[in-house]
Amino acid sequence: MKIKIITLGEKPPKWVSDGYDEYKKRLSKSIPLELIELPIAKRTKTGNPKLWMEQEAKTILGKLNDSDHLVILDVNSKIISTEELADKMQNWKFNNPNVVILIGGPDGIDQSIKDIAKEKISISKMTFPHPLVRIIIAEQLYRAYTILEGHPYHK
């Protein structure tokens, strides 16, 4: 199984990259993680967020393959626990070896992307800075992996 995380936004601060890299390193022997950072559409004060999301959707689609199992993070979807994520990872391992987790841009994810997503999940009803979400997702993937492996990291 391979997991790609696609995120939209500007280059994050070093501490974000360091945090993400720590969990990527921990997972690297078993589950390769790939981070794809895409730029957000250019925003203006009088612009249209729907158009921006449509532009971003085109960029996202250019990074997806037909074999990808697209999972989007969506605040309006079901909040899952770490144990539920572990169950999903177990299923992905056997049924969907190319998983893509999408962290949307500041205005959300275009409906065209939502329509092709295989799964929609939420990590919280709270709002987090998008750069921080990549650390949270990487850590949760690692934690879920340790549950599956019986490792004491998750207690």
Curated annotation (Swiss-Prot):
CDD domains: RlmH-like. It comes from the Bacteria. It is an enzyme of class 2 (transferase). The gene is rlmH. InterPro entries: Alpha/beta_knot_MTases (IPR029028), RlmH-like (IPR003742), tRNA_m1G_MTases_N (IPR029026). Keywords: Cytoplasm, Methyltransferase, rRNA processing, S-adenosyl-L-methionine, Transferase. Homodimer. This is Ribosomal RNA large subunit methyltransferase H. Disulfide bonds: none annotated. Specifically methylates the pseudouridine at position 1915 (m3Psi1915) in 23S rRNA.
